[in-house]
């Protein structure tokens, strides 16, 4: 390690390593790039030196490959490290089982291979000294519940071979890490949470894409999509030599963003080849149309300008290839300047002194000082100052990419002269921004409707504005050579699960080396992969949790340099709420990680797997939790296990591990096959097939577009053919729900809040076609697919008829009001529970058969529940208050995707009553809820 420049340990690294050396189970939860790897690597390598073995678990293959690369660079002959995952050639697996003493794998392989074949790994398990669970915050929801049971099975197998390994868990972002770690492993845990590592600053920008002139369902305004903005930004940043990761919510979206960004750079390459006159500066995408204003210094300043598929990502009204100037974004530009005031907004100005700006974009601020401006786009400055923000919507001709490219240039040029003044948020690292103490530093964070007060810097000398007209805004830095124009498009690629292993490793290497400057990726690269030298991260859509947001933002700046992270809002209630309420992000702790190992739908399959590995005994039951005995009895009654005097035995010839789909897809796999060639393109789980490869669906695979000719669920195949439709598709379903039992209830205003077990019946009934270039709906085609039944858990609230009668008398549509409130509530729940809106569903009705009252349900989309609805029950007042605020603060008249419309509504977003939903929620929230009974 000394040969690699490691001369000592930071205090938090030493503390965690020391606990592990003493045999204490420990979780280290510190900031991104804080050196957690060294904290567990030190005792792990020592274990190998002493003749022991180490098992390293990670959620992703990419992280395991990255860790293996780092281990091999140490050149320690006593450490025989190897990856054992689905990409490992079969001819290498025997050697790994017999000789490797540091095995890097994932929960899937542990579940399906290592534990069922534990006798083949007996030497490894007998000497197992340490289990490293890296990026453990990724183990949440149903997936986390499965992993918790897999770890319990691992402990049981180790006990069979006489070993009691020490567990070290690592996470950059975890709330109550010790509590979570105990729930995940079933073991008592020490925790290390004090981060003593040095950090560069990260500028966080919140961006709401502009409205277009188009109209969607019900005449609602259409906003430019987050993926379209991300593609433009990615192209612009790559053109500026800014190494960038763009996180996209879906595989299809990642492919589309990469294709679009490459197309834009192709246009730029053509323009450069045709018009280059010897200058070493690149033309900025769209700058030829930028307006300019003057900052307070008199310098000319540019004028104001998320693994599942989401409809917003894929139905894109402004992706390639629109007829416009070469790679033009045609949205103007924005100003980024440093000063003693901080203003982030759609005003065109920011300068030294406190500043005044109004508008929208990254954020809008008002205050007093030397400069003021109005406009659209983004403006950011750093320094000290206070203010309050206003909110309005940007126009379609604003330029996001110019804003952020100029902002990234500002970060670069200001770092040397004024390093302490560089940050829209004053926290020293992302963990501080996410921590509860950050509220003392942040008066209001950078985002629409906010300005930031950088505490402790009020007495600093005023730095010069960074919008120097001599600086190459949006182009290469002075002195850089012109890139080969023909190679520009090759600087961008896509990265996602489903690629061949060698292709993924080549992409990771190319990004590290700088051969690739921009990568559009799913969350496959969110965790831990060390890609030093990244300058910027684009996040297209709220990634689901604050933990994921800070984790993705932390991918940039890992080498200690300053960095830029941009959250681009999708057109849905949650994203819109966040960019208009940045206090929901900054100064807030990360969410509690929700998992439920006792879920019988999770526990049952793992008890079967455990019995198949080693027959279960009474002594094993405490390992699997308090409900294990009841679940075992049920498994015996189903004939899956047989009770004998000496324990429970697996009775089937099939593999018991096949009962548990730990990634939560469920059902059999549907093979996607090209009809003309028989080529296997990929596979999707059966529930997802109803919405992604139904007959008539548009299917994307590695940059190719296909049309689904026929979906045969019985045969398990979807036949597709190459096509180039000018539309995208997304499915719509209808849902019915019945109450099995209410576990808990308490009054909420004049109504009642419940949590309990329900049965949900869903059926995909049609799919929408949306024109790619314009975003307009061009068809709603019927489908004939079978219904699917799900027994799960839900939170629901009811209001009696005499309470809602006055609303009906005022002319509000009660069904439409409940429907609108349901949509918005689904959209906002991920802010309070560790979930995605696609992990949950909802049903609303003016009169439900089981309650006899107006009822709104929100349910977990996983069999047996995943803890999301229960979290909503616990936070109901906060959740529904935020829901009401999100609807009321939206500027539309009758409802739009930013507030009450849902892309997955099987009723075509009809009826919806926006004003009625506000009044309905006001009625429900008229008095605080009482304690739970």
Model-derived segments and their meaning:
Residues 1-29:
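Conserved pre-motif I regulatory segment
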Residues 45-66, 161-163:
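Conserved SF1/SF2 helicase motif Ia
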Residues 64-85, 183-189, 265-268:
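Conserved helix-turn-beta segment of the N-terminal RecA-like "Helicase ATP-binding" lobe
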Residues 86-127:
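Conserved helix/coil segment N-terminal to the catalytic DExD/H
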Residues 137-197:
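Post-DEXD/H (motif II) to motif III coupling segment of the RecA-like Helicase ATP-binding lobe
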Residues 178-183, 188-260:
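Conserved interdomain linker/interface between the two RecA-like ATPase lobes of SF2 helicase motors
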Residues 489-493, 497-501, 517, 523-574:
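Conserved RecA-like helicase motor core of SF1/SF2 enzymes
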Residues 562-565, 571-589, 596, 601, ...:
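Extended Lys/Arg-rich polyanion-binding regions
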């Amino acid at each position: 390690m000394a040969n690699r420049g490691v001369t000592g340990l930071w205090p938090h690294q030493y503390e965690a390593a020391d606990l592990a050396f003493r045999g204490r189970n420990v979780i280290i939860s510190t900031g991104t790039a804080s050196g957690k790897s060294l904290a567990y690597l030190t005792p792990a390598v020592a274990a190998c030196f002493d003749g022991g073995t180490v098992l390293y678990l990670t959620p992703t293959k990419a992280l395991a490959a990255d860790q293996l690369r780092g281990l091999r660079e140490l050149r320690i002959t006593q450490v025989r490290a190897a990856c054992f995952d689905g990409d490992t050639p079969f001819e290498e697996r025997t050697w790994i089982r017999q000789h490797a003493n540091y095995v890097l794998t994932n929960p899937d392989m542990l579940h399906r291979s290592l534990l069922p074949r534990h006798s083949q790994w007996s030497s490894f398990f007998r000497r197992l000294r340490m289990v490293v669970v890296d990026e453990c915050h990724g183990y949440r929801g149903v997936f986390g519940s499965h992993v918790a049971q897999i770890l319990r099975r691992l402990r049981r197998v180790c006990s069979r071979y006489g070993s009691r390994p020490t567990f070290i868990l690592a996470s950059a972002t975890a709330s109550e890490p010790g509590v979570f770690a105990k729930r995940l492993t079933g073991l008592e845990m020490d925790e290390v949470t004090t981060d003593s590592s040095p950090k560069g600053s990260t500028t966080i920008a919140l961006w709401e894409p502009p409205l277009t002139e188009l109209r969607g369902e019900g005449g609602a305004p259409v906003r430019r999509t987050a993926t379209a903005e991300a593609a433009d930004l990615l192209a612009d940043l790559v053109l500026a030599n800014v190494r960038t990761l763009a996180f996209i919510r879906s595989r299809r979206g990642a492919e589309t963003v990469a294709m679009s960004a490459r197309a834009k750079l192709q246009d730029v390459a053509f323009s450069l080849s045709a018009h280059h006159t010897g200058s070493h500066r690149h033309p900025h995408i769209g700058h030829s149309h930028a307006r300019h204003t003057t900052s307070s210094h008199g310098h000319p300043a540019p004028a104001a300008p998320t693994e599942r598929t989401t409809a917003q990502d894929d139905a894109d009204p402004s992706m390639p290839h629109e007829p416009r100037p070469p790679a033009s974004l045609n949205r103007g530009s924005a100003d980024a300047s440093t000063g003693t005031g901080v203003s982030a907004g759609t005003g065109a100005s920011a300068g030294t002194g406190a500043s005044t700006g109004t508008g929208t974009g990254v954020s809008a601020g008002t205050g007093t000082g030397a400069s003021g401006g109005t406009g659209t786009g983004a403006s950011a400055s750093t320094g000290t100052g206070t203010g309050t923000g206003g909110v309005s919507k940007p126009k379609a001709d604003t330029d996001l990419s110019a804003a952020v490219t100029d902002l990234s240039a500002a970060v670069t040029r200001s770092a040397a002269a004024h390093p302490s003044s560089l940050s829209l948020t004053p926290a020293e690292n992302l963990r501080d921004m996410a921590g509860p103490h950050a509220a003392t530093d942040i008066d209001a964070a950078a985002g629409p409707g906010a300005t930031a007060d950088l505490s402790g810097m009020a007495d600093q000398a005023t730095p010069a504005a960074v919008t120097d007209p001599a600086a190459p805004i949006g182009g290469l830095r002075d002195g850089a050579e012109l890139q080969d124009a023909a190679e520009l498009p090759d600087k961008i690629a896509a990265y996602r699960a489903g690629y061949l292993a060698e292709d993924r490793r080549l992409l990771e290497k190319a990004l590290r080396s700088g051969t690739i400057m921009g990568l559009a990726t799913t969350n496959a690269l969110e965790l831990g992969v060390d890609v030093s030298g990244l300058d910027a991260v684009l996040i297209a859509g709220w990634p689901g949790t604050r933990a994921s947001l800070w984790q993705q933002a932390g991918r940039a700046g890992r080498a200690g340099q300053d960095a830029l992270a941009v959250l681009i809002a999708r057109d849905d209630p949650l994203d819109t709420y966040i960019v208009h309420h940045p206090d929901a992000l900054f100064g807030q702790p990360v969410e509690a990680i929700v998992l439920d190992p006792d879920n019988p739908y999770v526990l049952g399959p793992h008890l079967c797997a455990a019995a198949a590995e080693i027959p279960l005994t009474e002594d094993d039951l405490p390992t699997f939790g308090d409900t294990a005995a009841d679940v075992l009895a049920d498994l015996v009654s189903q004939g899956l296990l047989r009770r004998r005097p000496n324990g429970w035995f697996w009775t089937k010839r099939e593999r018991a591990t096949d009962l548990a789909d730990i990634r939560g897809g469920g059902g059999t796999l549907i093979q996607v096959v090209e009809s003309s060639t028989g080529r296997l393109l990929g596979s999707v789980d059966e529930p997802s097939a109803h919405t992604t490869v139904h007959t008539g669906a548009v299917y994307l695979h590695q940059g190719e577009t296909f049309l689904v000719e026929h979906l045969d669920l019985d045969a398990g195949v979807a036949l597709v053919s190459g096509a180039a439709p000018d539309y995208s598709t997304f499915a719509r379903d209808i849902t019915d729900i019945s109450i099995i039992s209410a576990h808990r209830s308490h009054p909420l205003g004049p109504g009642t809040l419940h949590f309990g077990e329900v049965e949900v019946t869903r059926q995909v009934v049609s799919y929408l076609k949306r024109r790619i270039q314009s975003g307009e709906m061009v068809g709603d085609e019927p489908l004939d697919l079978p219904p699917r039944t799900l027994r799960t858990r839900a939170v629901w609230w009811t209001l009696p008829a005499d309470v809602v009668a006055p609303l009906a008398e005022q002319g509000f549509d009660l069904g439409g009001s409940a429907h609108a409130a349901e949509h918005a509530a689904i959209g906002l729940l991920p802010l309070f529970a560790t979930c995605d809106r696609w992990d949950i569903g909802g049903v609303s009705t003016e009169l439900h058969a089981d309650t006899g009252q107006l009822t709104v349900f929100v349910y977990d989309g996983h069999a047996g529940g995943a803890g999301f609805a229960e979290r909503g029950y616990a936070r109901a007042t906060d959740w529904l208050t935020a829901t009401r605020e999100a609807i009321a603060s939206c500027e539309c008249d009758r409802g739009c995707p930013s507030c009450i419309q849902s892309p997955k509504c099987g009723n075509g977003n009809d009826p919806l009553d926006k004003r009625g939903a506000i009044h309905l929620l006001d009625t429900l929230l008229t008095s605080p809820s009482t304690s739970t009974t």
